[in-house]
């Protein structure tokens, strides 16, 4: 039977309750490129919604919009951002419901999945603005078909909180909801900055970040959401000195480096399958239990909602969550 170490981070009391174990990652129970010089975007000068808009999207396409009364999104995170800006949707992919927990309503069409969007359903929904991800190949490949169908669309990429702020600011300009940019954008930036200020003079712990799935595990750097946050919090990622880990996670190399912390983010539909892979291929080795991170209960499973999916209005929570693990003595200050 798999054993585990569980630490419960309680934000209100800033305390951690720990159940001891020896081999499997500490499972965090709470669901909850930035620096102090990151983008300090300002809200729209007027609360009146824009009448038309021209901009260059993440793939370099020039986008011209004259209306956005019927907006659809092929990525749940971006659908949520549009709603956070005060917009409404006529269509979204199933991840908006299954992963983001959005209540779309009966009148909102389901447009397939993120990796298999349904072009026929998209056309039937008749959007005047379609929001897509620049990081999903199937969506990138739809550009010509969408153009031929006369569907205005734009590609976005969100790797860090500054990207989220830029997207939210644009959407709030479109909806005329300056107040929501302040509430869901500037307030979030303030939360992040407060955490970064608290940790700026702390030592730099070494970390290994692993993205685990049912058939493998990959070391990740700042090309990953959690990796960006770890970097901003002052952690030194092993992949910066051991780039070979990006191609192949060598247990021998990990043991030799002996990081202070090991973080795991799972992907795929089955978290248990991903953790089974970790158990069979890493934890079963007796040397794994001798790692400093495992010995000191610093082998941690991160919650998907904060470190796999885009946290959107919860970026501040993501930063605080990791900061309190890296620097527990600051937990009360971070809150």
Give a label for each model feature.
Residues 2-9, 22-77, 179-208, 325-335:
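Bacterial Sec-exported substrate-binding components of ABC uptake systems
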Residues 57-58, 109-119, 242-251:
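Short helix-initiation/N-cap motifs at beta->coil->alpha
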Residues 75-125, 129-135:
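A short, structured surface patch at a secondary-structure boundary
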Residues 138-141, 157-170, 204-225:
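Extracytoplasmic ligand-binding site segments that recognize negatively charged/polar headgroups
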Residues 17-21:
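C-terminal motif of bacterial Sec signal peptides marking the signal peptidase cleavage site
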Residues 165-166, 170-173, 179-182, 196, ...:
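Structured C-terminal subdomain patch of bacterial secreted/periplasmic proteins
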Residues 96-98, 218-247:
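Alpha-helical, coiled-coil/dimerization segments enriched in small aliphatic residues
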Residues 119-132, 151, 251-264:
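Proline-aspartate-enriched helix->loop->beta-strand connector
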């Amino acid at each position: 039977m798999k054993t585990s170490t569980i630490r419960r981070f309680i934000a209100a009391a800033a305390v951690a309750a720990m159940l001891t174990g020896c081999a499997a990652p500490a499972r965090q129970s709470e669901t909850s490129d930035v620096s102090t010089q990151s983008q300090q975007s300002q809200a729209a000068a007027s609360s009146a919604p824009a009448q038309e808009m021209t901009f260059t999207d993440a793939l370099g396409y020039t986008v011209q919009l004259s209306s956005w009364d019927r907006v659809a999104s092929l990525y749940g995170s971006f659908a949520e951002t549009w709603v956070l800006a005060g917009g409404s949707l006529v269509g979204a992919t199933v991840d908006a419901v299954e992963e983001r927990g959005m209540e779309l309503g009966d009148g909102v069409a389901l447009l397939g999945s993120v990796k298999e969007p349904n072009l026929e359903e998209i056309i039937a929904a008749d959007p005047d603005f379609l929001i897509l991800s620049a990081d999903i190949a199937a969506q990138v490949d739809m550009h010509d078909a969408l153009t031929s169908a006369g569907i205005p669309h734009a590609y976005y990429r969100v790797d860090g909180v500054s990207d989220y702020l830029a997207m939210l600011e644009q959407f709030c300009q479109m909806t005329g909801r300056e107040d929501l940019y302040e509430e869901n954008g500037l307030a979030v930036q303030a939360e992040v900055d407060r955490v970064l200020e608290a940790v700026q003079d702390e030592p730099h712990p070494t970390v290994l970040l692993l993205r685990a799935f049912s058939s493998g595990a990959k070391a990740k750097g700042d090309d990953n959401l959690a990796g960006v946050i770890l970097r901003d919090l002052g952690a030194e990622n092993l992949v910066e000195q051991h780039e070979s880990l990006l191609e192949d996670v060598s247990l021998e190399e990990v043991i030799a480096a002996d990081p202070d912390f090991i973080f795991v983010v799972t992907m795929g539909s089955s978290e248990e399958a991903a953790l089974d892979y970790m158990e069979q291929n890493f934890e079963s080795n007796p040397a794994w239990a001798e790692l400093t991170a495992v010995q000191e209960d610093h082998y941690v499973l991160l919650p998907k909602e904060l470190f796999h999916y885009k946290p959107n209005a919860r970026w501040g929570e993501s930063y605080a969550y990791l900061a309190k693990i890296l620097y527990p003595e600051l937990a009360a200050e971070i809150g």
